[in-house]
Amino acid sequence: MTDYGVRCDVRNVRLYHMHLEGPAPFAKPENAKHFRSISFFIGGNVRQAVQAGTADCIPIFLHEIPRVFNEGHVKPDISLIHVSPPDEHGFCSLGTSVDCVRSAASQSKYIVALVNKHMPRTFGDAIIHVSHLDFAVEHHVPLPVHDVKKPSKEEQQIGKYIAENLVTDGATMQMGIGSIPDAVLSLLGNHKDLGIHSEMFSDGVVDLVHKGCVTNNRKTMHKGRIVGSFCVGSQKLYDFMHNNPFIEMLMVDYVNNPKIVAKQPNMTAINSCIEVDITGQVCSDSIGPKMYSGFGGQLDFITGAALSDDGCGKPIIALQSVTSKGVSKIQPALKTGAGVVTNRAVVRYVVTEHGIASLFGKNLQQRAYELIQVAHPDHRETLEKSAFERLHVMPAP
């Protein structure tokens, strides 16, 4: 697409997209006059362009992205989608990425499909008939993979705290991608009747299904089924998803709707962030003023878990206590220009390798105390002094 656009000197094409895997040549500075990337969630392949101003992003809750198309805020001319080959009845599958695709496609003038035999066939809202496709191009290449990395000692400890203290038998779980969620999942081998209702899931879920730990039998909605909206993982995950009726891939405005999330029994939402301040404000999408990622589904699930119908929801923010350079991720105040994704009123638990900070019902003095206790020991004294300067009182339980 990029090569064709440059060769034909096509100008001012706006590309709206979710997180993308692989190279993004359209986002290179030399192609800025041809294409402008507008991301709903910034990936590493467009991050530099967004920060340089040659690309852009839309801050938005993941569950509200379909509204952008359904209500005409963005009117696509063409939807480029990725599907499996059609079955004997003419139905293709969106496979690993249902999220907001149907909303965008239904509002587009034309639908162009890349048909790939390596795309797993999934069910639910993933099914689309070939009669809806205006153009189809066969291109059979393996999907991008994210192989599981061994968690660090600190990530393993975070996973242990969460698995042993915050995840109960019968819990319904949401987790993102990364070493911390993988660490949590790897330590749930003795749990029973876990359920999955998550915008995404990865390889760790496959292992728990095979061990009999994830059954979804205590769920009250979609009982006996994993519910997701998109997936990124290894080939093992894609093979597990293919033709598997145990999995329902549904639209993200349903999966991530906080009202739907709140109905899940023992909803346990595990999300990460960039930094937290001593009052519990969570920054997840920027480093200071520089945009880094996006809202994603964090607040959708944190809110849903906090407002759970059964009163047993657990909204969890998990992070290592320091950066790779040793800078504390628990700060007296967020960096200048940093955005708040999850506000301090809805945060319940903050977990680092040093423990669990329980924040619900705590005043500012108590919150500062809880968070400083899970900060890295090298930074606690400085944080206490900064807390006193900010709150005019020493942190105390």
Report each predicted region and the residues it spans.
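Conserved alpha/beta enzyme-core scaffold
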Residues: 1-397
